[in-house]
Amino acid sequence: MFIVSKLLALALEPLFWTLLLLLGGLIALTRRPLLGRRLAWASLWLLLLSGWVAVPNTLLHALETRYPPPADGTDLRPFVGLVVLGGGLSDSSLWTSHKQMALNDQAERMTMAVSLAQQHGHLQLLFSGGIASLGGGGLTEAQRAKIFFDAMGLAPSRTLYEAASRTTFENAANSARLAGVDPHQRWLLLTSAFHMPRAMGVFQKAGWNVTPYPVDYRTAGDPSWLAYSLHDGPQRWQLALHEWVGFYAYRIAGMI
């Protein structure tokens, strides 16, 4: 499942298909010039389309608004802890090469976790994340998270770490097996808002009693249909397609 998910992520990259069409067009030009030109034009149109951010923003907005965050002033005393899903930390090589902590564009998963833990001293913090790269090696995300949370002043007695998971499905299954964790008690589930529908489905299917705490929003209200960026567009297309395809793939596989 892990390898399939990585191959699927590559297949959902708009620029991958742009390059594939362009290469196919160049190869076809020698024997079938008409086909070659059509493929080359298709690659150009796909590249231009990938910069139109309104469509992926609409897809992301639909995911992000499915689970609203808890209202201000919500009493969190009934919750025993906070499950934080990996994804907010930069690659292990950056940590080891520069001897510094490094967060990425999903950093709110980490910063909000610290904020909640500091505001609500009774909450146990459970971080779940292993090595999500095909090559493996280096510090697991849980090891990097421990360095970060320790540096932020969280007491080690309040933190638990699950370091084997590479997918959302494994996050739910492996975290439930940790000593001292009762998934039937009330937990907050913290992850990026666009990832929350899939995460909630998986955790609930695995028997967890979780309440969503979405962070890391990428959209705000109705998208502008005139917005265009060849820098942001392909990234947002990839993110939106990855989450929607992942959601339905998990549903078909019976994981949610």
Language model features with spans:
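Membrane-embedded alpha-helical segments of integral membrane proteins
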Residues: M1-L29
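Hydrophobic alpha-helical segments of integral membrane proteins
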Residues: I3-L8, V55, L59-L63, L241-Y248, ...
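Extended, histidine- and acidic-residue-enriched regions that form the cofactor-binding/catalytic faces
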Residues: L15-W17, V53, G254-M255
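Structural signal for membrane-spanning alpha-helices in multi-pass inner-membrane proteins
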Residues: G25-L29, G51, Y250
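Membrane-interface helix-boundary motifs at transmembrane edges
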Residues: L29-R38
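Hydrophobic membrane-insertion alpha-helices, especially the h-region
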Residues: R38-V53
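A structural signal for short, hydrophobic/glycine-enriched beta-strand patches
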Residues: L49-L230
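Extracytoplasmic/luminal low-complexity segments enriched in Pro/Gly and acidic/polar residues
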Residues: D216-R218, D222-Y228, G233-I256
